[in-house]
């Protein structure tokens, strides 16, 4: 009986994760206290950081909250940091937490409008190149004001819906009949080649849209969680953030669109497949049927969602309130005027963001270890000892490499904290801090499209129910992202090295942005325990 119970405990630990992964995490937890006792807290801190990055890289085996959280709890228990320092880090980044909790939930209630829009794009454009550019541009524009995860979720929902409709018809059923679109055994031979082509078509659209979320997400204060985190540290508001990033982000955006068009023209890296004409006909027939079924209540809800979306853009652009509170107003407006008043219907909106919000708190625990043990001090000192014109590109590359294998929010949190400490110690001046903050933000956002580990939206796509249906594996995603990674990363690096500083000086001279003081930074505490 006891042996059976023991096996049950082992099986329950980290659930469906592979046995080797479970043993690895247990080994980490056993080794860390021994290393702290024998080799000291600094070595243990570096080991913990490597272990935490491992949990992020293995996110497909097990969501990083549990293994990363166990490591963070142990770090506090063995004295690598304290609960007070962790709380200090969380409080200092409360606006980021509110963004994740309220803004993502708010956009959930605008999904019908977004679905309607993407459906119209998909059916209204016949040219695959134009369609790909529109999907990429629409995802970029939406991600500049909304949350990249939510935009990706909408694109997934649209593509899943269309895949399910065609798969149902290809299996000899009508729109109204129930059907398992994960089972290919019922697909008629006549439709098999069209189904293969349709899968390829959807894969390419999904990747264009996912990259679009990264292209737009880097541009504005709310596009990615780390943007707000960095803006809070620097004291930048919506307009200033956009202008400071523009010397890098706008050229990257243009080159991203050029890459999108080139990939569709050339048909390389798995792109170029058009939607089969038979499939398009079925989709159009289905859309017309849905339009006929739309009630006045449904249409009124779309109008309310559109008005709420306009308020969202105005609220963010004018900095009417902190980003998270603007998100809360979106929830209240969108639900009040569309009749969503039951608690369980509201609760569903928060499911998407809360796991990542919890994971972000674990990030801050690891950042607290880095701060207390001063792990990155030698790295930062080395980069700051370089010639001034080399510092920005050096930070861009360091962030880019780490963000390709780890989570970019975590990487940004670590580096902006360390550069902030350097400013408070008078090792750099405030203008240099602002330039380095731009390099850190773009370095964590742009090269991170290389793998699903870096971009939360990519990981979300890879782990969705749609990915296996359209045969989108980890390896295929990396290959399809490769041309984007190369073009966008090199463009960002060149702009950081050559254009960022003179463009920023031009913005200062013309009064578009203002010089900040060191005291502006100190409003968001950076020194652990103070």
UniProtKB/Swiss-Prot annotation:
Top-level taxon in the UniProt lineage: Bacteria
InterPro entries in alphabetical order: Na+/H+_antiporter_NhaB
Q: Chief location of this protein?
A: membrane
Q: Where are the transmembrane segments?
A: 13-33, 67-87, 90-110, 138-158, 205-225, 245-265, 302-333, 350-370, 449-469, 477-497
Localization, per the record, is: Cell inner membrane
The record lists the catalysed reaction(s) as: 2 Na(+)(in) + 3 H(+)(out) = 2 Na(+)(out) + 3 H(+)(in)
Q: Which GO terms describe its cellular component?
A: plasma membrane
Which Pfam families would you find in this protein's record? NhaB
Q: Name one GO molecular function term.
A: sodium:proton antiporter activity
Annotated keywords: Antiport, Cell inner membrane, Cell membrane, Ion transport, Membrane, Sodium, Sodium transport, Transmembrane, Transmembrane helix, Transport
Membrane-protein topology = Multi-pass membrane protein
Function, as annotated, reads:
Na(+)/H(+) antiporter that extrudes sodium in exchange for external protons.
The protein's matches in NCBIfam families, at most eight in alphabetical order, are given as: PRK09547.1 (NF007093)
* UniProt similarity note: Belongs to the NhaB Na(+)/H(+) (TC 2.A.34) antiporter family.
- State the protein's name: Na(+)/H(+) antiporter NhaB
Tell me the name of the encoding gene.
nhaB
């Amino acid at each position: 009986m006891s042996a059976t119970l023991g096996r049950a405990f082992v099986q329950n630990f980290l659930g469906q994760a592979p046995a080797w992964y479970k043993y690895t995490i247990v080994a980490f937890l056993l080794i860390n206290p021994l290393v702290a006792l024998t080799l000291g807290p600094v070595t243990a801190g570096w080991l913990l950081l490597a272990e935490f990055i491992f949990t992020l890289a293995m996110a497909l085996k097990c969501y990083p909250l549990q293994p990363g959280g166990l490591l963070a709890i142990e770090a506090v228990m063995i004295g690598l940091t304290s609960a007070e320092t962790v709380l200090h880090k969380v409080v200092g980044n409360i606006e980021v937490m509110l963004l994740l909790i309220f803004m993502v939930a708010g956009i959930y209630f605008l999904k019908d409008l977004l679905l309607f829009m993407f459906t119209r794009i998909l059916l209204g454009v016949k040219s695959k190149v134009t369609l790909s550019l529109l999907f990429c541009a629409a995802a970029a524009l939406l991600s500049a004001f909304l949350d990249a995860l939510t935009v990706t979720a909408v694109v997934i929902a649209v593509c899943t819906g269309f895949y399910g409709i065609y798969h149902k018809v290809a299996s000899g059923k009508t729109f109204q009949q129930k059907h398992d679109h994960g089972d290919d055994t019922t697909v008629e031979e006549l439709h098999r080649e069209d189904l293969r082509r349709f899968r390829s078509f959807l894969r390419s659209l999904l990747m264009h849209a996912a990259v679009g979320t990264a292209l737009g997400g880097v541009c504005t204060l709310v596009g990615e969680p780390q943007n707000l985190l960095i803006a809070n540290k620097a004291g930048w508001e919506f307009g200033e953030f956009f202008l400071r990033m523009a010397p890098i982000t706008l050229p990257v955006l243009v080159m991203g669109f050029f890459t999108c068009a080139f990939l569709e023209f050339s048909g390389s890296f798995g792109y170029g497949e058009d939607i089969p004409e038979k499939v398009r006909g079925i989709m159009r027939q289905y859309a017309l049927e849905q339009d006929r079924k739309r009630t006045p209540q449904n249409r009124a809800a779309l109008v309310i969602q559109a008005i709420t979306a306009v308020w969202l853009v105005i609220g963010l652009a004018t900095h009417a309130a902190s980003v998270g509170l603007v998100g809360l107003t979106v929830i209240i407006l969108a639900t009040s005027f569309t009749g969503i008043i039951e608690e369980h219907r509201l609760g569903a909106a928060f499911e998407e963001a809360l796991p990542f919000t919890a994971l972000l708190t674990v990030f801050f625990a690891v950042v607290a270890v880095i701060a207390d043990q001063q792990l990155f001090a030698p790295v930062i000192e080395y980069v700051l000892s370089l010639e001034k014109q080399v510092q920005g590109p050096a930070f861009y590359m360091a962030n880019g490499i780490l963000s390709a294998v780890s989570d970019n929010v975590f990487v940004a949190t670590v580096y902006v904290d360390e550069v902030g400490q350097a400013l408070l110690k008078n090792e750099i001046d405030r203008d240099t801090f602002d330039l380095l903050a731009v390099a850190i933000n773009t370095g964590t956002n742009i090269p991170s499209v290389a793998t699903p580990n870096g971009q939360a939206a990519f990981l979300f796509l890879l782990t969705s129910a749609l990915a296996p249906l359209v045969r989108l594996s980890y390896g295929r995603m990396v290959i399809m992202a490769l041309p984007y990674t190369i073009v966008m990363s090199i463009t960002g690096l060149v702009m950081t090295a050559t254009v960022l500083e003179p463009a920023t000086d031009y913005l200062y001279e013309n009064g578009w942005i203002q010089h900040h003081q060191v005291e502006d930074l100190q409003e968001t505490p950076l020194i652990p325990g103070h």
